[in-house]
A protein has these predicted regions:
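Active-site anion-handling motifs in enzyme catalytic cores
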Residues: 1-288
Length: 288
């Protein structure tokens, strides 16, 4: 349940002839119910955490987890997901928009839609049909974007099929006119490329066998709260969730505040670079 031990915890360093420094960058607890971790296991986790030369986390919930399992001795800073620096670090890997449009048969204005095949995460086919009709009236092509191991739920006129390389996946989001769906990393890509989005947030700590969900632990909610973009999100993983209408969601895309995204992305890129400088200093490497 708590994934211990795995390489994440750095126990493998005990088997090396010469110790190496271990840094933990923008870690996330994935909505772990860490307060139920047995005391003996928490003690082992604490020893691992305190041996890191650097640790940072991706959200406030993970920060609280680290503080809890270390009895307050480690309260790591919240730092950006590394994907926020993709354009800085790997823009040369991206194909052009013209190439993406040609290979995937896309129009100049396409909207990506991606829902997990889970009744607590997805929307109905009727909802998708209405969204597609609205988009078509505005000259926008609706396109189904798959997950890494499965296709998106529902049917649209156009679908991106698997296999799909990570670089093409990123480029598809970067060049789109919008994204609607689940998961965090599409939102991260949209934010730092100022692409309009609406998140059906499927993260959070579930209670009462999934009847209720505490979305305060959501990684998406944390990012959008900091970016002041919570109006582009709805919690989607509770049985009692409220599903916004397709017209409401499409209107949110049309009135999306791109300037706010640009400003936030610049702040987060600066924080990312500061984090990397600190990591290199701690592990004794030259950051240049």
């Amino acid at each position: 349940m708590w994934s211990f031990p795995i390489p994440f915890w750095g126990l493998w360093t005990n088997y090396l002839d010469k110790p190496v420094p271990v840094a933990l960058m923008s870690a996330a607890s994935q909505d772990s119910k860490y307060k139920f971790i047995p005391k003996h296991l928490r003690k082992q986790m604490k020893e691992c955490v305190m041996s890191y030369c650097y640790a940072s986390v991706r959200d406030e919930d993970t920060q609280k987890m680290f503080s809890y399992i270390t009895d307050g001795q480690c309260c790591p800073p919240v730092t950006p997901d590394p994907v926020f620096a993709f354009n800085q670090n790997a823009a040369s890997l991206l194909p052009s928009k013209a190439d993406i449009m040609k290979r995937y048969g896309l129009s100049d204005n396409y909207l990506l839609v991606s829902f997990k095949n889970d009744k607590r995460s997805m929307v109905s086919q009727t909802w998708l049909n209405e969204l597609q009709n609205i988009a078509t009236q505005h000259g926008v092509q609706c396109v189904s974007l798959p997950f890494s191991t499965s296709r998106s739920a529902g049917e649209l006129d156009k679908e991106i099929c698997l296999p799909l390389s990570p670089v093409d996946w990123y480029a598809l989001l970067k060049y789109s006119c919008g994204y609607i769906g689940n998961n965090m990393h599409p939102i991260v890509v949209c934010i730092h490329n100022a692409v309009p989005f609406f998140s059906f947030d499927n993260y959070g700590t579930k209670h009462a066998n999934g009847l209720f969900c505490d979305s305060s632990t959501s990684k998406i909610r944390h990012i959008l709260k900091v970016a002041d973009l919570l109006d582009c999100r709805v919690a989607s993983n509770s049985l009692f969730r409220h599903t916004p209408t397709p017209s409401h969601v499409f209107d949110k895309l049309q009135t999306f505040d791109r300037d706010k995204c640009v400003s936030f992305a610049q702040v987060y890129l600066k924080k990312y670079n500061e984090m990397m400088v600190t990591i290199f200093e701690r592990i004794g490497c030259d950051s240049h």
